[in-house]
């Protein structure tokens, strides 16, 4: 949506509110609640934030950007996609930072995306599961390690990497006490859904030195820098070549690769069906246990 169209749409909405107040003699006319809010935390992410925002724009009713003091062009890029940009000083706790971001979201559902990630073009197939009774949809994340010949890590630390990213906007759902790799609370029932995909760009954008610095920062915050995840070169299971600091348009380079396009648009029905069945079995078992108590 262009800036002109967006402003025109907002003015029409405002006009409808005023007319409704006059006709129906109401104090406040409440507009319909947005369906999907997208939350992205940022700080100096000018190299990747455009990929994240561009990928979610077709699906988001609102995009919330929570920044903690960017000094580069991150906010300039974010302003092209949303006017809902907030600032909160980072106090060494990612869980608290995300909880603040969640409080700014008004949609019925919230999708949390990291600033160095993007979603595949089949994300819409994931959204159909939002009406199936779950409070949380867990998605698979793939850590891309090469764009010259599309590949992602398949080591134990990187695959399967299930991420709790689609959550119902429920005040009972929040991030817990973990300072790093924060843990979501009160998210059941949850579905592991292999329909849409999240792609992680960290290994393309950052060389070994930058990733080692990040791992050390996380270790300082929480006593666990997750070196197996961020520094696979140090471990014997590392077998894939990584292409660091690639050409500026990563998505264009990736989508020239036919195998990536096929992967991006693929939905693994078997995994999703398996997880749905597991949830149904757990539900039935819980009902049976409750019945037996009486």
Segments (PLM) and residue ranges:
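Cell-envelope/extracellular polymer assembly enzymes that use nucleotide-activated donors
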Residues: 35-37
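Acidic helix N-cap motif at the loop->helix transition within catalytic regions
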Residues: 50, 72-81, 122
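A conserved acidic beta->alpha catalytic loop
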Residues: 55, 59, 67-76, 90, ...
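Conserved donor nucleotide-binding strand/loop of the catalytic core
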Residues: 61, 75-100, 104
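Catalytic-site signature of metal-activated, phosphate-bearing donor transferases
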Residues: 95-102, 120-290
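Short aromatic/hydrophobic "clamp" motif used to bind/position activated sugar donors
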Residues: 110
């Amino acid at each position: 949506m262009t800036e002109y169209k967006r402003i025109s749409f907002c003015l029409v909405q405002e006009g409808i509110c005023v007319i409704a107040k006059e006709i129906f003699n109401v104090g406040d006319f409440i507009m319909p609640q947005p369906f999907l809010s997208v939350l992205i935390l940022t700080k100096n992410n000018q190299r990747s934030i455009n990929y994240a925002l561009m990928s979610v724009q077709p699906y988001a009713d609102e995009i919330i950007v929570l920044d903690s003091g960017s000094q580069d062009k991150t906010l300039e890029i974010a302003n092209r996609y949303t006017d809902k940009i907030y600032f909160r000083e980072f106090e060494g706790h990612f869980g608290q930072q995300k909880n603040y971001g969640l409080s700014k979201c008004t949609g019925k559902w919230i999708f949390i995306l990291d600033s160095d990630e993007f979603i595949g073009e089949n994300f819409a197939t994931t959204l159909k599961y939002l009406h199936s009774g779950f409070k949380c949809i867990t998605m698979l994340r793939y850590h891309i390690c090469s764009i010259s010949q599309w590949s992602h890590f398949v080591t134990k630390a990187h695959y399967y990497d299930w991420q709790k990213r689609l959550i119902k906007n429920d005040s009972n759902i929040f991030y817990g006490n973990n300072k790093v790799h924060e843990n979501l609370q009160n998210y059941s029932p949850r579905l592991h859904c292999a329909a849409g995909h999240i792609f992680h760009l960290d290994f393309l954008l950052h060389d070994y030195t930058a990733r080692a610095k990040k791992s050390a920062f996380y270790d300082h915050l929480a006593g666990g820098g997750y070196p197996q995840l961020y520094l696979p070169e140090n471990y014997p299971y590392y077998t894939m070549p990584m292409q660091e600091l690639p050409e500026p348009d990563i998505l264009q380079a990736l989508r020239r690769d036919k195998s990536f396009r096929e992967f991006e648009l693929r939905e693994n029905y078997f995994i999703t069906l398996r997880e749905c069945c597991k949830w149904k079995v757990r539900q039935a078992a819980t009902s049976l246990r409750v019945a037996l108590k009486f």
